[in-house]
């Protein structure tokens, strides 16, 4: 007897792990029988051939992507994982995708090409070209007689009538379609007359849409310098062109929406931007006007004539203060002299008189010295101030080439607004006056 003794549960679990590990994602073809769909939405069926059968399950999230309704007796191609339902020990398939048997080979080719191009980097997001924000011209590569073209043109005309449209007619089904689509993509890139290309058609079966799964079309889309939007079939239809294109639109109508801008929305945006621009201009104008007024006031306060008047007033104040200081110094000295004279007269002693007389003579000498020194200092300071005053004299300013214009009332003209046409004005220059008439 073997040393390993399994329970039924252990055996079923080990068998399930072995099956799932060795039979993952296999392709299987067979005939449907015993098809059921309970309220859960899952599909349960049996796949069989003339010699055997196997139970299958396809869960609701997977079967929602199947484009047809399975029927008993239908031949299908499925991709599935082999598993085992442990509670009953039933061996079964968990189906991932299902196609009619006629489409099975095409689906296998689709998956193989998809893996090949993905490995080469044709689907890389960092290589996708950005669509222009505002398209000026759009190219449409599709059938000239198909409903997809009419849908695109109708939406473009409604949303953006000014948008230029260039149609590159081509077959979108049949043997010639692949070569013609490639030719039109290359033609559009050579002419460079549009900003973006829409490549697509309306809905159809897998065989009808197969030209958009061809490798030649995929590589032409990848080589294009113009951004390309793929718009093939309905939202549930997925092609190789969708993966390679710079952007996928679920329908041709959706592609038209992507490349056009609604004029009403644009006008609303323009009005909003205009309002913002007007508000910004008003704020700027107000700020600059206030600054101009401040500069005009500063210029008026710093006018040479105003500065001259202020300096003259300051010089007059200094001169008056100097005169008062000299007068007070003289009066103080005179008072001291008088007091000493009185004291001398009141003292009868001759030697005291003589001593006071000597002191008086000394005081006279000191007084004369102090007075002369004070007078000299004040005269020097006065001369300095007079020199500065003379430097600010209007005549000196005029001698340097400046002039002062006055209106008939004798008021200085500081602005063109201070005179009117026909007024006589007087212009003071260094050596005289000039009378002029405003024209």
UniProtKB/Swiss-Prot annotation:
Pfam families: Exonuc_VII_L, tRNA_anti_2. GO terms for biological process: DNA catabolic process. CDD domains: ExoVII_LU_OBF. Its main location: cytoplasm. Its EC number is 3.1.11.6. One of its GO terms (molecular function) is exodeoxyribonuclease VII activity. It is an enzyme of class 3 (hydrolase). It comes from the Bacteria. It is found in: Cytoplasm. GO terms for cellular component: cytoplasm; exodeoxyribonuclease VII complex. Keywords: Cytoplasm, Exonuclease, Hydrolase, Nuclease. It catalyses: Exonucleolytic cleavage in either 5'- to 3'- or 3'- to 5'-direction to yield nucleoside 5'-phosphates. Belongs to the XseA family. Heterooligomer composed of large and small subunits. Bidirectionally degrades single-stranded DNA into large acid-insoluble oligonucleotides, which are then degraded further into small acid-soluble oligonucleotides. This is Exodeoxyribonuclease 7 large subunit. It comes from Haemophilus influenzae (strain 86-028NP). The lineage of its organism: Bacteria, Pseudomonadati, Pseudomonadota, Gammaproteobacteria, Pasteurellales.
């Amino acid at each position: 007897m073997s040393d390993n003794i399994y329970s039924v549960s252990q055996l079923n679990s080990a068998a399930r792990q072995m099956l799932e590990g060795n039979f993952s994602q296999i392709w299987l073809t067979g005939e449907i029988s015993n098809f059921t769909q309970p309220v859960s939405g899952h599909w349960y069926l049996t796949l069989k051939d003339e010699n055997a059968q196997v139970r299958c399950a396809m869960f609701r999230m997977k079967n929602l992507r199947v484009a047809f309704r399975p029927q008993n007796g239908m031949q299908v191609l499925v991709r599935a994982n082999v598993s085992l339902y442990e509670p009953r020990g039933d061996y079964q398939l968990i189906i991932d995708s299902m196609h009619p048997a006629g489409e099975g080979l095409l689906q296998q080719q689709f998956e193989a090409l998809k893996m090949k191009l993905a490995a080469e980097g044709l689907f890389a997001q960092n290589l996708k070209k950005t669509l222009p924000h505002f398209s000026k011209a759009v190219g449409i590569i599709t059938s000239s007689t198909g409903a997809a073209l009419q849908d695109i043109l109708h939406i473009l005309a409604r949303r953006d009538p000014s948008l230029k449209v260039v149609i590159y007619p081509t077959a979108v089904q049949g043997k010639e379609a692949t070569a013609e689509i490639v030719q039109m993509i290359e033609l559009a890139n050579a002419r460079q007359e549009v900003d973006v290309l829409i490549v697509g058609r309306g809905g159809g079966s897998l065989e009808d849409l197969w030209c958009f799964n061809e490798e030649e079309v995929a590589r032409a889309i990848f080589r294009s310098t113009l951004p390309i939007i793929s718009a093939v079939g309905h939202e549930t239809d997925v092609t190789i062109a969708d993966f390679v294109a710079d952007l996928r639109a679920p329908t041709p109508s959706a592609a038209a929406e992507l490349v056009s801008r609604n004029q009403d929305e644009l006008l609303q945006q323009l009005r909003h931007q205009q309002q913002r621009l007007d508000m910004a201009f008003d704020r700027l104008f107000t700020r600059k006007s206030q600054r101009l007024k401040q500069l005009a006031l500063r210029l008026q306060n710093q006018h040479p004539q105003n500065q001259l008047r202020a300096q003259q007033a300051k010089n007059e104040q200094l001169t008056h203060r100097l005169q008062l200081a000299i007068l007070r110094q003289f009066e103080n000295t005179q008072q001291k002299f008088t007091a000493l004279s009185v004291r001398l007269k009141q003292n009868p002693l001759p030697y005291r008189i003589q001593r006071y007389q000597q002191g008086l003579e000394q005081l006279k000498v000191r007084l004369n010295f102090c007075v002369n020194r004070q007078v000299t200092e004040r005269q020097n300071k006065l001369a300095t101030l007079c020199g500065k005053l003379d430097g600010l004299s209007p005549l000196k300013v005029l001698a340097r080439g400046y002039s002062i214009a006055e209106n008939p009332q004798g008021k200085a003209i500081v602005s063109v607004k201070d005179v009117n046409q026909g007024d006589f004005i007087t212009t003071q220059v260094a050596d005289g006056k000039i009378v002029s008439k405003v024209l």
